[in-house]
Amino acid sequence: MTNAAKHLTNGGRELIAFRVGDQEFCVNIMAVREIRGWTPATPMPHAPAYVLGVINLRGAVLPIVDFSARLGMKAAEPTVRHVIIVAQVKSRVVGLLVDAVSDILTVSDRDIQPTPDIASDFERSFARGVLAIEGRMICLVELDSVFPSEEREAA
């Protein structure tokens, strides 16, 4: 058994880390279906400001969400350097525009620190904790909380 496999059977989990601006975030790897390069999206009328539009993903219409804008940060200006994380959010599949994918992490539950009390209610609603790894601070995000039910329908 590999060290990673042993770690996972001992309460560990695998996460995908990615950059948005100067910050790093991570999500459960099981929510990620694929990572692909930036594809220009077709804008949709009346969509929330953080929804860039839709793309055709092998015959399926995939909404593309500017993850930075969704978190209340400065909206991204997509370039060929950006990537789309195709992720499952409850019963929907969405594309998350991020700057770059940085790592696949294997962590134990004790590596995850609680979200600081200084975080806003919005941040606490989606942030499940903070990881301090190799001098980096990485926010663990719960995607189901980033997209409440009524907003998932809009996306």
From Swiss-Prot:
Residues 12-152 form the CheW-like domain. GO terms for cellular component: cytosol. It comes from the Bacteria. One of its GO terms (biological process) is chemotaxis. Keywords: Chemotaxis, Cytoplasm. Signal peptide: none annotated. The keyword Cytoplasm applies. It is found in: Cytoplasm. CDD domains: CheW. Involved in the transmission of sensory signals from the chemoreceptors to the flagellar motors. This is Chemotaxis protein CheW. It comes from Rhizobium meliloti (strain 1021) (Ensifer meliloti). The lineage of its organism: Bacteria, Pseudomonadati, Pseudomonadota, Alphaproteobacteria, Hyphomicrobiales.
